[in-house]
């Protein structure tokens, strides 16, 4: 009798296991969105926006942090048709894209701005299948924060940097206009003097290992001098993936946001991702 009862219990348990497995297998996966999602990330200084392509819910993707020009915001980037050309190309790679508030409109790559972006990056990574890798794109003033994030002492690792008409030399920005000087002094808490070399991303880059860089600049730019920013920084570019794109026209002109430049930008980050993936598989 005891054996019969044990046999019946075993049979029942097996049947329940099969039924449970079948029920689990019968549940279809949630459908992927057909268009990239936009996730709003709130901070006191203003919102940031994470763009997630559908593929980055199914497969692991890297994150590109985009830092905005002076006097602008993540909302301006989100609404900009020109910036959207670049973002759409990155989403197609596929890469997730964080349009960062950078701690305010005129933070000039300050330590406080970098700390806020570090927290935004961590929060953004919880919203998609993040592989842990991060890249940076800086527009004009945003070049300082993007470059600083890839240098020793940054609160998070960055595998490559793209600057479009980007500032790299904080001392150069501080010395070219009184309005910039006042904003930089406020952002960095300076007591009237110029920024110390250890606050200047270009000075730090000149002492650090070479970086994968994608630099877009114009000799006609009368806002961010090409020779004292992009040209000097080009000397710190890692051979191989790095690219220097010289264009004509004024600061942040329309040709910076052309499909051609967007394709070059996406290809740059795509190459870095392919290399990083290959290296990870070898470990």
What kind of feature is each model-predicted range?
Residues 25-59:
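N-terminal cap/lid segment of alpha/beta-hydrolase-fold proteins
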Residues 127, 132-180:
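Primarily recognizes the serine-hydrolase "nucleophile elbow" in alpha/beta-hydrolase
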Residues 60-70:
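Short beta-strand element of the alpha/beta-hydrolase
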Residues 108-128:
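Alpha/beta-hydrolase active-site loop
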Residues 174-231, 235:
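The feature captures the conserved acid-bearing segment of alpha/beta-hydrolase catalytic domains
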Residues 7-19:
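Bacterial N-terminal signal peptides
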Residues 231-283:
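C-terminal catalytic histidine-bearing segment of alpha/beta-hydrolase fold enzymes
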Residues 77-97:
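Short amphipathic alpha-helix adjacent to the substrate-entry channel of hydrolases
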